[in-house]
From Swiss-Prot:
UniProt KW Membrane keyword: yes
Name this protein carries in UniProt: Xylosyl- and glucuronyltransferase LARGE2
One CC-aspect GO term: Golgi membrane
Lumenal side stretches: 30-690
Gene that this sequence comes from: Large2
One example GO MF annotation: glycosyltransferase activity
Sites carrying sugar chains: 51, 78, 202
Cofactor note: Binds 2 Mn(2+) ions per subunit. The xylosyltransferase part binds one Mn(2+) and the beta-1,3-glucuronyltransferase part binds one Mn(2+).
Amino acid sequence: MLPRGRPRAMGAAVLLLLLLLVVGFFLFGRDPDYGLGTTATLDEDPYRSRNLSASSPQLLLPPKCEMLHVAIVCAGYNSSREIITLTKSLLFYRKNPLHLHLITDAVARNILETLFRTWMVPAVVVSFYDAEELKPLVSWIPNKHYSGLYGLMKLVLPSILPPSLARVIVLDTDVTFSSDIVELWALFDHFSDKQVVGLVENQSDWYLGNLWKNHRPWPALGRGFNTGVILLWLDRLQQTGWEQMWKVTAKRELLTLMATSLADQDIFNAVIKEHPHLVHPLPCVWNVQLSDHTRAERCYLEAADLKVIHWNSPKKLRVKNKHAEFFRNLHLTFLGYDGKLLRRELFGCPNQFPPGAEQLQQALTQLDEEEPCFEFRQQQLTVHRVHITFLPHQPPPPQPHDVTLVAQLSMDRLQMLEALCRHWPGPMSLALYLTDEEAQQFLHFVETSPVLSMRKDVAYHVVYRDGPLYPVNQLRNVALAQALTPYVFLSDIDFLPAYSLYDYLRASIEQLELDSRRKTALVVPAFETLHYRFSFPNSKAELLTLLDAGSLHTFRYHEWPQGHSSTDYSRWREAQAPYSVQWSADYEPYVVVPRDCPRYDPRFVGFGWNKVAHIIELDAQEYEFLVLPEAFSIHLPHAPSLDISRFRSSPTYRNCLQALKEEFHQDLSRRYGSAALKYLTALQQARSRA
């Protein structure tokens, strides 16, 4: 007979054994091949609880000054926009220095080098790698995915990243962070000695093969893994013979599957199916996948659980999802977030400043905020973020006499773009001064316009708003620097050129036998109408009829006649051939010049003297001004800008402009010596007349 306490002990032992069997079933009973024992699947509640533990207090974070490394493959115009939103979300939450390793094509590199150089974010290092070097390594793999060859390049990252780099987080451009990336980096410490890659389980049934009839996916463990967020332990990867491993697997599977459907993700999963010990499953909140067939809602309970949102559907923000509106709003928050605010982060780490930022900050702190012209001085020192070729752009084939129209505008002038495209069939380079939010409105405006969406030879460059004064000459310089043709027509957005002007300018350049060695500025006579609706003249004869009838006027004839008087409109009426004119004080014609002409003086911001200074520079460099007899451009009426209103109403504003003029002439004297005396004399005479 057993002692009275013995049955209770045996009962407890049986219960404990049953509990262990249940736990073992959950950990190891899901899939004969899925013996990872580290996380549960989307179909099971334990998965949710374990994944939500990612932010638990037990997570040991690296030191605050440890550099975190992030690799991103980015190609083309659209991905270059996507990566900015991703970067904003990264920077918003991060507390560690970041080193971004960007594998780019030539288009993306040109865009992103300019953007990050002008963004000047502290404690961020950016390195670029040429994606062309990786193409031969993956071009043998047929790929049905819309990402093309670039979607396979994560397989070969170890061959292009520095050998000294041990660990890196690899991201797709279509992810948005809602947490500090250092928490993700800390998960490297959870890897076993044999694990080389960290991935989140795929959150759809794609790899189960039951989405539609005869669907045959690549092999995977259970649901497989998604490669939108990857933790790569690079040195271990090399030691395992990764290159040989994935190539052998890919070649074997391609014998029957013929092509990848999900690019690198298919090959990663096939390798992991064969070598499950290589993968460390990550908590699902680090890659909440919003694909067409996602079951991601099983991963999170509330917004605080989310770490990374992955828009991995071709539909992107238009994907149908139970919580799509919430995710969309989170993404749109960063889309419209003012990127300049991310410059002001405080890091107690050495070498946190980007090149030139420390000197710039010192110059700004030396300014006297009580000085009347403080705004002008501050604006001169402002470095604006610049996103060149904001939209897809197809430059025209090179032609020896081709001309690009160059102009700048702000949001309130967008309505001019369609009319300008109808009048000018040639290439254009336009700089837009916008906030981050306005840039998205502009994007929508172009995409929904039948006229603008068809014009791929128009390059739009966004200069992000920063400061109270309009940086007109910096905008012009941005647009001018991005022109790709031998000649440029330096215009303004409120002007519509004659319908025939583009062809006429090219023919004139050829007939006059101009080349870059001949310093010539072709003057396009400027006119204006005070009517919002009028019949645009198709020829010089029609224009003269409207001029005689009082429907048109020479530009600014009643406010600023000296600005265009040297063009000599009386002579132009009768002219049959180009004629030469001399510079005079305050002359500011619209001209066609070689692309390598002098840049505009960026000290002139707001309203006043910005074009005048440029024409003086052309004259000082001995450009000849030739007026074209059949050319014309017409200014349309519009509401006055804020800057011109301030110029008219504020004596301080006008005094500051006068101070800038004097500084400009002092610089001219230093550069051109006695040859610049005539410009100073003209300025003094104009001041005495005033």
